[in-house]
A protein has these predicted regions:
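A sequence-level detector of short, solvent-exposed, charge-rich linear segments
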Residues: 8, 15, 19, 23, ...
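ABC ATPase nucleotide-binding domains
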Residues: 1-60
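A composition-driven signal for long, intrinsically disordered, charge-rich low-complexity tracts
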Residues: 3, 8-11, 65-68, 180, ...
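Non-catalytic connector elements of ABC transporters
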Residues: 65, 74-191
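ABC transporter nucleotide-binding domain
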Residues: 45-79, 113
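Phenylalanine-focused residue identity feature
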Residues: 15-17, 57, 61, 67-68, ...
Length: 191
């Protein structure tokens, strides 16, 4: 894929590449059009589509995303505060969303943007607690589910395996705290 992209750039021609493989699309593209039922939902760069999708559909279509229902408490040009039942109050910076106080919204966080902590971090912004669910070791990373008290569906968390270990890192029902950066959150209107 990387060689094909280099060849395209050296020759300087335009490629139109149709694929269902998201990794291929993200690797080979300068711009991606996400379509649904024959209609273009969004056109943007791979980074823009992944990090700042413009709709819940695109956010869910490109990669994995955890969605939490919320309501806007405050909104300025530089920050948004959202109240959610599952996560509590969420602070968001670097948001492209133009939201109004009282508006229903989705708080969307990618699984790799949620960092697990296995000892109580104390009072910390953008932190919630839960219990470990099932996990899967995938070689370079592990996926696991966290059950939150105020949410029926578990939250998917992706953790990079930075150390060489084949031991199970996480035990079911173990307490865990999830933390995320304020600029790792995407806020989307909930219609």
């Amino acid at each position: 894929q990387i060689e094909l992209r280099q060849l395209q750039q050296q020759i300087g021609i335009t490629f139109l590449f149709v694929t269902h493989d998201q990794e291929e699309a993200l690797t080979l593209s300068d711009r991606i059009a996400v379509m649904s039922e024959g209609a273009v939902m969004e056109i943007a760069s791979p980074g823009q589509l992944y990090e700042s999708p413009g709709s819940p559909f695109v956010a869910d279509f490109i990669g994995s995303m955890n969605f939490f229902e919320g309501e806007i408490l405050s909104s300025t040009d530089s920050a948004i505060t959202v109240e959610t039942s599952a996560l509590g109050t969420v602070s968001v910076t670097n948001s492209d969303a133009k939201m109004t106080v009282g508006q229903k919204a989705w708080v969307a966080i990618r699984p790799e943007k949620m960092q697990p902590v296995f000892a109580d971090p104390g009072e910390h912004a953008n932190t919630t607690s839960g219990t470990m669910g099932p996990s899967a070791y995938l070689g370079d990373r592990s996926h696991f589910y966290v059950h939150l008290p105020q949410r029926e569906d578990p939250v998917l968390v992706a953790l990079q395996n930075l150390e060489r270990s084949i031991a199970q890192l996480h035990k079911p029902n173990q307490p865990v705290w999830l933390q995320w950066a304020s600029d790792a959150v995407v806020v989307l209107p909930r219609d």
